[in-house]
Curated annotation (Swiss-Prot):
Compartment(s) of residence: Plastid, Chloroplast
InterPro entries: Domain_X, Maturase_MatK, Maturase_MatK_N
GO molecular function, one term: RNA binding
Organism encoding this protein: Lyonia ferruginea
Name of the protein this chain belongs to: Maturase K
This protein's record includes keyword Plastid: yes
Gene field: matK
GO terms under cellular component: chloroplast
Coiled coil: none
Pfam family, one: MatK_N
Keyword Chloroplast: yes
Family: Belongs to the intron maturase 2 family. MatK subfamily.
Function: Usually encoded in the trnK tRNA gene intron. Probably assists in splicing its own and other chloroplast group II introns.
Amino acid sequence: MEEFKRYLELHRFQQHDFIYPLIFQEYIYALAHGRGLNGSIFFENAGYDNKSSLLIVKRLITHLITQMYQQNHFLFYTNDFNPNKFLGCNTNLYSQMIFEGFAVVVEIPFYLRLLSFLEGKERVKSHNLRSLHSIFPFLEDKFSHLNSLLDILIPHPVHLEILVQTLRYWVKDPSSLHLLRFFLHEYPNWNSLMTPKKSSFSFSKRNQRFFFFLYNFYVCEYESIFVFLRNQSSHLCSTSSETLSERICFYKKIELEEVFTKDFKAILWVFKDPFLHYVRYRGKSILASKDSSLLMNKWKYYLVNIWECYFYIWSQPRRIHINQLSNNSLDFLGYLLSVRLKPSMVRSQMIENSFLIENAIKQFDIIVPITPLVTSLSKAKFCNVLGHPYSKPSWAESSDSDIIERFGRIYRNLSHYHSGSLKKISLYRIKYILRLSCARTLARKHKSTVRSFLKRLGVGLLEEFFTEEEQVFYLTFPRASSTSGKLYQRRIWYLDIFCINDPANHE
């Protein structure tokens, strides 16, 4: 890392986060394109054309800045300027390169803060905590002792100007932020860079790295405020939350006789809960507590006001649900989570008398919902919305072994991810859909019926649809009968899963 710092000449800009000169360094764009130091934590291969001229990128930045200061109204292009061509190149392509390079540069101060934070501390070398499954053992251990939770969908999108204003408190470099604001507002197709959807928010394939950085920064800022409220909850009776509106004075407390905020227009309630747990994945988060739903209502009130007063986002009430774990299930990361009361009878013997004691134990229950899986398969054209299998004509040109392997890989990935549920009935139906879809694809290729093709193929088709844990079971119990389903009852969490595989991505 020391060599990397010298290579970027960070010792000249590190003290004041002066990153503006780095934007004009050509090797920054080489790093952003994956041409050097691919093993770094925050550099990834972006897959650009090797024929791209970094010199043109540098000239393009200079031209944009010149245009910005020459035009009275900060017009991006003159009347006779072609927005699609500049210096014989595609402007959109090089604007994309500028965004990617800028994302790399802006990430540097945050990475340096991370290094300074980790100095003198024992770093966890294992990547297991990055796995999606690493969260479920924690939920198993904690959720059975909790009563209520908030099911939160983080609101979006945030206006880009708000993100720039928030970013300036962390990156104290006005020149870089002015250039960033100029790119965002004067980019010819900046509205198409982000694609809002009904229930989610996604980024276009162009400039993903840059806007992922802005979105992650927004979530980080929201969570820092949340953590501040959580840690300072016992002091809210004498502290104004006016500091939430000014990030510069974030950690400075303003003592007031009465707790009345200027922006929130409400009196803060005092609360303190040592059994408060927070979990987030992408835009969905969970706030669970052992206390009553009254505390959850207070937290809901605070979160809504934070989003409206600090980020100027109107949060719809339906985006935050108060859920009682004992009565409802929680949809999280492809599972339905709930806490069920499992009755148990204990016989007690006292001298000559015996009696039964009825007891109820809270048990963390995990179910794989079938509807989202079937919907995902139907979008990928493996079946219809009711689960009736289709053939895949686009795969019919491949070899038989390749077709079987592709179908088998999709099922193994789905079964691998949903191995944490003890109830496998949903996975059995998914296996049925994929096996029949595979058989119909092969029959279509060989211009035969499914029945005759399966008779000729035998059980060879089934072998590709066995997962690793099923193979271990059948090797251990080779003579297991139909009762094997009852014997094979165990919950497995894999620590090598970093994303949810969508069947549509296997197209």
